[in-house]
Amino acid sequence: VGFGRRAAALLLPFIVACSTRHRAAPSEEGSTRPSKHEQRVIELDLTAGAPEALSGGLFALPATRTYTGLVRALEKGLAADTTAGVLVRFGEGGLDLAQAQEVADLLTRFSKKGLPVVCHADGLTNATAAFVQRACTRRYLGPAGEAETVGLAAQVVYLHSLLDRLKIEVDFLHVGKFKSGPEPLLQDGPSPEAREALDAALGSVRDGWLALASKPDARAALELGPFSPPDAKTHGLVDELGYASDAVAEAHRLAKTTATEVVYGPRTSGKHGFDLGEIVHALTGGENETSSPHVAVVPMQGAISTSAGGPFSSGGITSQAMVKVLQRLAHSDAVKAVVVRIDSPGGSPLASDLIWHELMNLRKKKPVLASVGGMAASGGFYIASGAQKIYAEPSSIVGSIGVFGGKLVLSPGLKELGVSSFTFPASHAEGAAERAGYLSPLVPWNDETRGRVRALMQGIYDLFIARVAEGRKMAAEKVLVSAEGRIWSAPQGLERGLIDQIGGLQEAIVEARTLGKVPVDSAVTVEGAAEGILDMLNLGDDDEADAAHVSAALARYEARRTIALDLIPEEFRPFVASLTPLFQGEAVVAALPYAFTVR
């Protein structure tokens, strides 16, 4: 990618100061580095999680450090004759529920081959506590940790009464009776429709979560925590209390070898830490270069917008960058099939439509499949419908086909404080001031403007239905039955034709190889980081920027992003970020009406 290399050159003076000397991964006490043909325990270090996208902040992560890299590492480990066992380290975190379900299924394949799978966690979450029940033959919990497996619940915060006290008027509309996005601003509790949809989706997700535990006692305990380590052992959630070194020793004992190879995570063998070359390599996309026929995975994670920026943006999916990625893949002779990995609550309908359009063009040239992580909701599902086939995990959320939009009117509250405003329209026609300032927080909507906004939303909703119908090859009437803004679990979506198969990223890659007619052991590249970095920094492709410009842009971006995001509790950030298009001048969003995260 031409400008990706220029970006690396421009950033060189800046990042040389933060480069580190290349160091070998430290060996655990009792571990040895394996020779080429020696039997070994392969280790998965999940202490830093498994990010879906390459951009784990301002700099791109190596492709091997993404969730796709984790799936590939397991695929290779399963095929290797030298694998004698598996060690999984969680630390205090690990995986979200959709990832945990797929990785657990992959690890059971090692167990079926008679290979030990030893897992260690400093602390367990809902997702990892269920994971270890299914995936691990031996389960360790840190003596000072805890098992925070407490069951699943959703919390929605309602602000209607507070806004009333502050004299802030809420002008929000929605299309779809289940599209409850504005409800927290308009009501003090959920509508019957919102309660019905959320109860049904949570119940289905809960069923998939509990199904990870095969033993009845452990399954029951998943909803009874939090537990101290001794109580977690008593309830059958873990086998032993101990440190990571104890789990390492047990893995070596069961595998009958002291050789260990870290195949995933920040401690990957021979790749401990970043040096300057690795950062430049990642920025330029160099590690993804291969002329051999292969499958490309395109991670699309986060809120959807037309471009990077906005007060609450945390990166996410931008049509500005993603369209370039998809067009490049369409023209690549080496890329024989594409898997789009989606985890998004939605966002801009315009950006969603632009990406959908490129996927539809791409699938005319080569197979395009979608793999859903935590969710493909609203705008996320809009994009997913552009793929020929959609895979989703049992806990994935899909659907939410609907739109909402509006604004908060601050003028009554400001008037109470002695602040007044007056709009001077250029035209003196009746209603000109209301029309010209229809997105202003100082001008309330009149009936005519509200009617026009409602018509605008209905048009976007109708287009949303038509796009899903075209992409999924369904009648629009059938899509409407599952629309109205309602969310669905993946099993519910399968029954309704919204997805094609319950399965994870690995199944999607296998299918893509088959459809693309590439070998089963062919490479898998992870695409998408280099295209967006200059856009993120507000430096266009044609800018002649020097190191000073880039350094200033880096500082500007981080300061703006950090200040805004620090105002929002972490669990609400995905939803708030999906509203970024409203702050960028769009009147309507296609977004999940609340933050939905299962840990």
Regions found by a protein language model. Name each.
Residues 137-138, 239-240, 337, 388-389, ...:
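Well-ordered beta-strand positions
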Residues 89-226, 342-482, 486-487, 514:
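Conserved catalytic cores of soluble enzyme domains
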Residues 221-242, 479-503:
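Active-site-proximal helix/loop microenvironment
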Residues 77, 81-93, 331-346:
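Short acidic, glycine-rich surface-loop motifs adjacent to enzyme active sites
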Residues 145, 243-245, 504-506:
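Beta->alpha turn/N-cap motifs
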Residues 3, 7, 18-53, 59-70, ...:
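Intrinsically disordered, low-complexity segments enriched in small/flexible residues
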